[in-house]
Amino acid sequence: MNLEVKKIDTANARLSAKLSVENLEKRYDKIAQKIAPKVKIDGFRRGKVPLSLVKTRYQAQIEQDAQEEMIQEVLKNALKELGIENKDLIGSPNFTKFEKKDTHFEIEADIGLKPTIVLDKIKECVPSVGVEIPNEEKIDERLKQLAKDYAKFVDTDAQRKAQNDDKLTIDFEGFIDNAPFEGGKAENFSLILGSKQMLEDFEKALLGMQAGEEKEFPLTFPSQYHAEHLAGKEALFKVKLRQIQAREALEINDELAKIVLANEENATLKLLKERVEGQLFLENKARLYNEELKEKLIENLDEKIVFDLPKTIIEQEMDLLFRNALYSMQAEGVKSLQESQEKAKEKRESFRNDATKSVKITFIIDALAKEEKIGVHDNEVFQTLYYEAMMTGQNPENLIEQYRKNNMLAAVKMAMIEDRVLTYLLDKNLPKEQQEILEKMRPNAQKTQVG
């Protein structure tokens, strides 16, 4: 074997090798001898098939296995010459040449190595952080909302007319072209008027009705309605209002605190106000971080933390971004790229900057997570996906299986780790008094959230 290895920088190396055809043919014989005892061909007993016939019948598999063996040997020797271990190899080598000549094979490949990352400029990267402290007005607004949310619905007198925030029990049936349609009928159906549980025009038609009253009204389904067979159609609805219930107002006092903080001993309005203030602070913090500071922190990390990146990983990320773009493109756009190799190359190349930044930030986050011992358990990933399923009306098991099938669970975990690392860095840069608010909130993290 004739091998040359050149280290380009701390994260990249290039190898070129020449291997004799004779070397490869010897591998063919060894592999054929290895599989021969398991081969069964009509007319021969198992294990008694002539080696020449095994090599002919399984030529493609034998050649592939031999080439893979040869590649692994080349890589092993290249790493040895570089003085690095296999665990320091990143991703798969990118073979730029694999040619068979008359007497030998010529191989050239780019190798990605684990980058060396120095985290001495992290403090310079973290932007100044100042979260808005909730004022009395905001606290009072949330207390009023809590009083409303926890209020029970009670029966009303027969003369009451339906108004927003009332709970109605109705029977209804819809017709299109004088015929009932699927999903257009229900009995003893409950809805909160004004909650947008039903179409806005449907709820508006119920305003002012009294218990026992019946009503007919036309309704046009939106052109973008989720049920395609109803989108844009004109319907006639017949509704009977069975019952109206109104919220029984709750006073903002210690009794409300005991209801909201049911898991707390000796809950008081003072304690509830403290919890509300803390919850509002956390919401303000999350909004500031997600809408502004995390992105600023990422930009600073990208700019100030400098190290060599493995080019093979950048190329793989470009491939991923290019494939994702193809999935979201119109058929005409995909066809245009298929017909022009030059256009396809240009499109793929347009993702280089994004791919480079993505790879770089991933390496930085991984290094920070290890240094600060920040991780995410698999169960937390599943909980996140369960929540996503609930919010989107999907089956949790099906959603998790979909992520698993598409090898996306690792990406979800990495995104969660990134979020925790960025939050950790920003939290450390909070003013002292705001860090104290956070510390005060942590013992109550598992208790009832307010609002």
UniProtKB/Swiss-Prot annotation:
Chemical reaction(s) catalysed: [protein]-peptidylproline (omega=180) = [protein]-peptidylproline (omega=0)
Record has Cytoplasm as a keyword: yes
Cell location: Cytoplasm
EC number, as in UniProt: 5.2.1.8
Domain of life: Bacteria
SUPFAM superfamilies, sorted: FKBP-like, Triger factor/SurA peptide-binding domain-like, Trigger factor ribosome-binding domain
Family: Belongs to the FKBP-type PPIase family. Tig subfamily.
Free-text note on domains in this protein's UniProt record: Consists of 3 domains; the N-terminus binds the ribosome, the middle domain has PPIase activity, while the C-terminus has intrinsic chaperone activity on its own.
Name of the protein in question: Trigger factor
Protein's organism: Helicobacter pylori (strain Shi470)
